Amino acid sequence: MTSTSEQPPSQRPSPWRPLALALLAVLGLLAIWSKIRDPEEPTATTPFVEAPVDEVTRLGLVALRQPSTGTLNVLVVFAQFQNEIGLGERIPDYATRMFDPDTPGSFTHYYNEMSFGQLQINATVLPRRYTSTQPASAFLADTSTEYGGYGDFSHEIMKQVDADVDFGQFDNNGPDGVPDSGDDDRIVDYVFLIMRSVPRNFLYGGATGIKGLGRDVVTDDIGAKGRKIMVLRKGYTGSIVAERPYAQTVGIMAHEFGHGLGLPDLYDTSFQKVANQDPADDSAGIGRWGLMGRGAYGWTEDASQGPSPMSAWTREQLGWVGVDNDQLQQVIMPAGGLHLTDVRHGGSMLKVFL
């Protein structure tokens, strides 16, 4: 993916070209997150393959995104196809622990650590699994180079959920921090749709995760301003992910939610548009060094250590280098005496201009 550059002020010496480096903290200055695999869940080696993003998102030019500070109310829905109904409606035992803020390795703990507490995630996990009225085959694309019918699937599931849930309680992006209070936008903050299985060509080829729900849903719930609450198909309001063991599921969700914050992928996605090109033969971008690269599973393919921390560049974009980037130190001129210490304990991240 292409990363944006930053132009230093004109008074800076001309020998220094205004190209912003990926921050030095990628190696030593990332906040080291304590990552623990759920001991009750086996590890697995299921690769995470993401569906292609649109050009605007690819360039990091998302006009609409979730705020990176405050409190968001997230709805979590587990779902399956009609042909899986024999497996029952029970959700995974780890489902609620994924959002325990006091559990290292949870989704909520991860984003609390990365944001220095500036973004709080309140999640509601629905207690049963929802089932479509049609089998998986009804939603599959004919080829691996076109999108599948995941939008129709998600629309049906959201309509089922609408009978059980007041979607107004998940519209909480206004300044007062109170859901559906009148200062919100009548759009549900964020929905995770977690699939028991993701067959090939359901999303896009072999993808197991995608930003966006594919279709808008107008719910039956009336908001504070007398208008119906909506669930939008856009990538900043939801995602569809494959159900995996605990740590893998958290990693995929964390990556997709990053798109909801307006972050681009930090790896080369050309393999998704070139027939028979192996992803391993292409550029991995920042690789496993950051969540928005290939870091959803962390340093091991079984995700036993949880997702990688966000890169320093990513955190700068969100204002998360300390609180409102107050620990970002810009190095404009050659300087000595710089010390790299843990950002969790007041250390700085360095941004070096060349």
Regions found by a protein language model. Name each.
Residues 85-125:
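Active-site-surrounding "flap" and adjacent substrate/cofactor-binding loops of secreted or lumenal enzymes
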Residues 9-22:
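N-terminal Sec-pathway targeting helices
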